[in-house]
């Protein structure tokens, strides 16, 4: 009789362990799906910010070109820098497959840090160029 109880309890423990393993596997796959969705959201937000920045810079560049007509050497250099920044922004619109494979293993915080570093690397020069261009424009108007 004791043997039957031992077998029954062992069976219950084994089935409970199997269920917990199954639940762990399911929760792990759910976490992977959520991480993948978060990556897509982050990329979507980054793409939207980059496209908004690009359109603003294009409008600014067109405005400068229309307003000044002929450019001085300094204006020409500023426009060259803006065009280089625009090319950099265009290259960020289409991330390569390799970078996507690299980011799959990162957690959300690491991914957010990567995007922040890229934004700082791009937005710093862009803001300084826009600031200097606007400063030159204000000097010419004033």
Curated annotation (Swiss-Prot):
Cleaved signal peptide residues: 1-18
Tissue/organ expression? Expressed by the skin glands.
As stated in the Swiss-Prot or TrEMBL entry, residues carrying the post-translational modification Phenylalanine amide are 68
Q: Does the keyword Lipid biosynthesis apply?
A: no
Q: Which residues form the propeptide?
A: 19-43, 72-121
Keywords of the record? Amidation, Amphibian defense peptide, Antibiotic, Antimicrobial, Cleavage on pair of basic residues, Cytolysis, Fungicide, Hemolysis, Secreted, Signal
Listed InterPro entries:
Bombinin
Q: Where in the cell is it found?
A: Secreted
Q: Name one Pfam family in it.
A: Bombinin
Question: Major place of localization?
Answer: secreted
Record GO cellular component, one term: extracellular region
In the record, Isoleucine amide modifications are located at 141
Q: Name one GO biological process term.
A: defense response to fungus
Q: Which family does it belong to?
A: Belongs to the bombinin family.
Its annotated function is as follows: Maximin-y shows antimicrobial activity against bacteria and against the fungus C.albicans. It has little hemolytic activity.
Q: What name goes with this protein?
A: Maximins y/Hv type 1
């Amino acid at each position: 009789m004791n043997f039957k109880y031992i077998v029954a309890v062992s069976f219950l423990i084994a089935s409970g362990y199997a269920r917990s393993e199954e639940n762990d596997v399911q929760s792990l796959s759910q976490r992977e799906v959520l991480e993948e969705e978060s990556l897509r959201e982050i990329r979507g937000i980054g793409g939207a910010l980059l496209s908004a920045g690009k359109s603003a810079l294009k409008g600014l560049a067109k405005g400068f070109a229309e307003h000044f007509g002929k450019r001085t050497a300094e204006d020409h250099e500023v426009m060259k820098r803006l065009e280089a920044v625009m090319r950099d922004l265009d290259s960020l619109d289409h991330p390569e497959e390799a970078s996507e494979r690299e980011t799959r293993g990162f957690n959300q915080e690491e991914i957010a840090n990567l995007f922040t570093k890229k934004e700082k690397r791009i937005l710093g020069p862009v803001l300084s160029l826009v600031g200097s261009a606007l400063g030159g424009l204000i000097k010419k108007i004033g």
